[in-house]
Amino acid sequence: MSYWINKSICKLNYDSIDNIINTIEPHKPYNNNYCKDNFNIKYLDENNILDYYSFLYKNYNYKFNLDTIKWLLLNPFSKKEYNILLYNEDKIAGTISGIKKTISLHKKIYDCIHVTFLCIDKDYRNKYLHYFLIDEIMKNAKKNDIIIALFNSNIKFNNVKYINEYDTYITYGNKNLIKKSDYFNYELLNKKTQDLFFIYTIEEYNYWFNNNHVVVISYNNNFIALLKTNMLINKNIIQIFIIMEMYIRNNNIHKNYIPNNTIIYENYKCLKTIKLKSKLISYIYNYNFNNLSESIYLF
């Protein structure tokens, strides 16, 4: 808690007015002289993306292919300084990325970053580099007038208020997958009833959901988008699918429309499932709240 106590993240004992965005970040960067003296920062580009890909494949839970990484992180909506690579000489020691998104938060529209790919090489995990990287990406976001960030963690931070905690599952036993692709009115994604959800322009919708990196299942104006990747499970690399977006209008998506090996949250179960040990806890940076109903899917 020593790091988070000085950060603008909602605390369990926070007694100020709820539903208020903090516009001023405390000027207390994480004091890591080791990091300052021994590391240098670069940003992801075509020149270092192969090194980045190898680093993630070695150190990150999900095993993305190179084209998917390029599509996710070198997208036309995010700034290059949202993809931070921390080098010790010529070796990547840690990374963090932020994908620029737009959210509806209590019916008001804000830009934010979806923070992901926070990854530290195992040789450096006792140096608290993740705190330094979080400070760096929030500093860069603020320079572009973005102060809200969303992120998942498998850690429940002491005395920090989280949006939601999810069990995770892998589905199995579906040998008759049907990829249903009826017309879907994307504007329905922008009209959800929850307090917090992503919204999209037509350009963003086409970029994120009209490609070979996701499986889109649409039926009778129900919509699920699943990000394709791989994961090491029981010493085997298997293909999995992670929910990126979902709009369930009437629960009439048939179980055979859902792929095998789907990392799926507890609010939408299908087929036979294996409950994983890991949980996902979602947080919001720079926003104080009491309860916050949401329809966001982070990875």
UniProtKB/Swiss-Prot annotation:
InterPro entries: Acyl_CoA_acyltransferase (IPR016181), NMT (IPR000903), NMT_N (IPR022676). It holds the Pfam family NMT. Its EC number is 2.3.1.97. Keywords: Acyltransferase, Transferase. This is Putative glycylpeptide N-tetradecanoyltransferase. It comes from the Viruses. The keyword Acyltransferase applies. SUPFAM superfamilies: Acyl-CoA N-acyltransferases (Nat) (SSF55729). It catalyses: N-terminal glycyl-[protein] + tetradecanoyl-CoA = N-tetradecanoylglycyl-[protein] + CoA + H(+). One of its GO terms (molecular function) is glycylpeptide N-tetradecanoyltransferase activity. Adds a myristoyl group to the N-terminal glycine residue of certain proteins. Belongs to the NMT family. The keyword Nucleotide-binding does not apply.
